[in-house]
Amino acid sequence: MKTYWNIEKTLKAIPEWQPNCWIQVTCPTDEDQRELEEKFNIPDYFLSDISDTDERARYEYDDGWMLIILRIPYVKEIRSRTPYTTVPLGIIHKRDVTITVCFYETNMMIDFVSYQQKRGEGFTDYVDMIFRLFLSSAVWYLKRLKQINALIEKAKHN
């Protein structure tokens, strides 16, 4: 799923790409990936690295493109023996193009959009948006750690 967001005064969905908008790509199809590579000429290995569930967090720069891979919290299935894990979130940027790509639908990204819309403000620039993504990730890590600690305490008392 691909969503284009105007990020200037408020976070508002728009029908197509415009310079300086945010392109949020969640669970991209092969067609979505092809379009990103062809329309924006992003390095093809960026998307394959983001799709690798074991990819480590890192920063990379190639031909003017910046790639940041974050590991963000993800709950596989609450009934799973190990429901908590992390998945890669790719942030791709060059001049007037900012794209986030995650091959999983995560509560963090849903909440990030919802929270920014409730704030009623956009982002000052792509750096502001990236730092807010880092902050959101930290908040969700703390939330998941509290849940894990509660489960540990419950297991101790049983």
Regions found by a protein language model. Give the residues of each.
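Peripheral, non-transmembrane regulatory/ligand-interaction domains of membrane transport proteins
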Residues: 1-158
